[in-house]
């Protein structure tokens, strides 16, 4: 029974990292994932392979699962895994190799492992630079106050920027690093202005980027 599972916790080390990842991720999307993880922690089952997961963070997983259900978000193993881990940069790098995560999951975990974000003033700006999936995941992890912003990003697609390096060069900037710098300046101003498409507004933002 449970005692036998606890006694054989170290046997997990004999399993392949892929097997450990697959089993953990399968558990994380179960309806009672937080309860199951809490039981595993109480038995010391996870300690040999994932000592970073501690009982104090199980409540984060429970809250996230409740939020997913309330907001209509599908359970996601990587997002739920992030809820169990200490918030620090480089989570994907740290756990990607240990659990043989895919490049995509490693990048997602890196993004979600950053310190808890504040509620963004403009969720679309956050989504533009981090991607809609990451922005919505971070809002789910943030708490109930992120619901309106999360809803605003439903179906959101990253708009194409109306200016390219060619436009910068056509304005007299010598090809090279300066073009990229000016283009980045334009991009920041354009996104902050709500990604306008009209020629007058775009032209004014381009003028400002070249000033």
Identify what each model region corresponds to.
Residues 58, 135-211:
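Charged substrate- and nucleic-acid-binding regions of tRNA-handling and nucleotidyl-transfer enzymes
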Residues 1, 124-125, 175, 198:
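Residue-level recognition of alpha-helical structural elements
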Residues 3-148:
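Conserved, hydrophobic alpha-helical core segments of structured domains
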């Amino acid at each position: 029974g449970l005692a036998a599972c606890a006694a054989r916790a170290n046997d997990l080390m004999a399993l392949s990292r892929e097997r450990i990842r697959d089993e953990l991720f399968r558990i994380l999307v179960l309806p009672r994932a937080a309860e199951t993880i809490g039981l595993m922690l109480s038995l010391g089952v996870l300690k040999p392979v994932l000592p970073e997961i501690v009982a104090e963070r199980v409540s984060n997983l429970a809250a996230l699962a409740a939020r997913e259900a309330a907001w209509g978000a599908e359970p996601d193993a990587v997002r739920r895994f992030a809820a169990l881990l200490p918030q620090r940069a480089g989570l994907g790098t740290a756990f990607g190799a240990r659990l043989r995560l895919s490049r995509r999951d490693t990048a997602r975990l890196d993004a979600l492992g950053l310190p808890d974000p504040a509620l963004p003033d403009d969720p679309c700006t956050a989504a533009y630079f981090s991607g809609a999936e990451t922005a919505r995941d971070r809002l789910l992890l943030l708490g109930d106050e992120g619901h309106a912003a999360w809803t605003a990003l439903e179906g959101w697609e990253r708009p194409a920027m109306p200016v390219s390096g060619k436009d910068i060069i056509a304005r007299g900037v010598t090809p090279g690093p300066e073009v990229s710098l000016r283009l980045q300046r334009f991009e920041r101003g354009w996104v902050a202005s709500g990604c306008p498409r009209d020629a007058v507004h775009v032209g004014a933002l381009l003028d400002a980027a070249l000033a």
